[in-house]
Structure formats: structure tokens, C-alpha cells
Amino acid sequence: MTRRYWNIHLEEMMEAGVHFGHGTRKWNPRMAPYISAKRKGIHITNLTRTARFLSEACDLVFDAASRGKNFLLVGTKNKAADSVASAAIRARCHYVNKKWLGGMLTNWSTTETRLHKFRDLRAEQKTGKLNRLPKRDAAMLKRQLSHLQTYLGGIKYMTGLPDIVIIVDQQEEYTALRECLTLGIPTICLIDTNCDPDLADISIPANDDAIASIRLILNKLVSAICEGRSSSIRNR
């Protein structure tokens, strides 16, 4: 795997509050190697370790993007949702930022059926076909379309399982992480001091509750993805 420089600075991470963990009572002992101190009842994450694993993750996604791999970003809690969507759109990645529907990956055939239905309804709306239906039928299909847009809008162009999944908040997205583990899909996961660092392929110790922290980590990762895609185009 190519090792590159990703412009990761400890000062920048401190300003974003990446180092603030959970209260010392809410912690996973497996996170001990990634914690540098306790301050006012809060665990402080070792940002040197954060920088190391973030750099490794950037190397991984750069190489994967340069080989045309597909990415899925997952972060459904309110503090992560907007950052996940904007980061994914910027890097042309798929994303889930509202609710993880159980079996979204492990029961891919069902998800694929829903996506086909979603695409058909979108096409019918664009052509005006929905408006030519009886009012009751049109209203029902529009509600269905709205529901599908909310939960599948970020993966509407997915045609198969993703090659790498990036997860914000291991605890919140545990179902998504388990599905990736079941299917053997590589994962990169933001982990706070209450998480298990051994579950993901690359775990990045970071504050997963602060918007600035989430945004900073995602920005570094999607910048690496964008660079990887650009290098692929240049090398053709």
C-alpha cells in the first residue's frame, strides 16, 4: 500500500475537539492504548495514534479509489448526517445518513428490489406519469417515493455491494458494522472511548459526537478518495 502525506496536524485536530472522549465511567477497557489522559472526568484520546490510523486509512482509500473501488459512508445520527452526505457527494460515494435498514447489505437482493422500485418511481415522476394517475394512486406512490428517497436516496446508484465501508460512530451503526463483518467487507470506523477498536479493519480513535471532529476526519478521508480517483484518471 502506498504511503503518502495527508496534511494531518495535531493542532487542527485539537481545535476540532477530536481528542475529547466520553466520561471515564463510559469507556471500553480495550480503548486503553488509545487514551492518553483523564481530564475533568473525561478520557482524552491520544491524537498521535489518531493521526497514525487516519493516515493509514487515507492510504487505504487512496489506493482503493485509484483502482476504481466503490465506497459507502454510514452515519445516521443527527450530528453526523449532514457531514456524511456532503462528504459522500463531494467524493462521489454512496451513503446512508437517515436510518440503516437491517439487511441492507446482507440481504442485498431485497435492497436491490427496493432500488429498482425507487428508480422506476423517480422515472415516472420525471416523465409526469404519476400526475396522470388517479389522485389516490398518485398520492400513494408519491408517499412511497418520498419514503424511498429518505432511506435509499444516498445509495440510489449502487449496483452491488460496496468495496469499503466508512462508519461514523461504531455504537450507533453496530448493525451496519456487523453486516460488513458477516460479508467480509473492509471497514474504516471512527471509534470513541466507549468503542471496541478490534471490530473494524482500521479504527480511527476520535470524538464521534462533535460535528467539527466528524467533519475533519471525513474531509481527510474523502480528500484521499478524490486524489485516488484523480490519479487513476491521470494514469490511464
Curated annotation (Swiss-Prot):
A GO biological process held by the record: translation
PROSITE patterns: RIBOSOMAL_S2_1, RIBOSOMAL_S2_2
InterPro entries the record matches: Ribosomal_uS2, Ribosomal_uS2_bac/mit/plastid, Ribosomal_uS2_CS, Ribosomal_uS2_flav_dom_sf
Gene Ontology cellular component list: chloroplast; mitochondrial small ribosomal subunit
Gene Ontology terms for molecular function: structural constituent of ribosome
Top-level taxon of origin: Eukaryota
Keywords attached to this entry: Chloroplast, Plastid, Ribonucleoprotein, Ribosomal protein
Compartments in which it is found: Plastid, Chloroplast
SUPFAM superfamilies reported in the protein's UniProt record: Ribosomal protein S2 (SSF52313)
Pfam assignment, any one: Ribosomal_S2
PANTHER family cross-referenced by the UniProt entry: 30S RIBOSOMAL PROTEIN S2 PROKARYOTIC AND ORGANELLAR, SMALL RIBOSOMAL SUBUNIT PROTEIN US2M
Family: Belongs to the universal ribosomal protein uS2 family.
Protein name (database record): Small ribosomal subunit protein uS2c
Organism: Liriodendron tulipifera (Tuliptree)
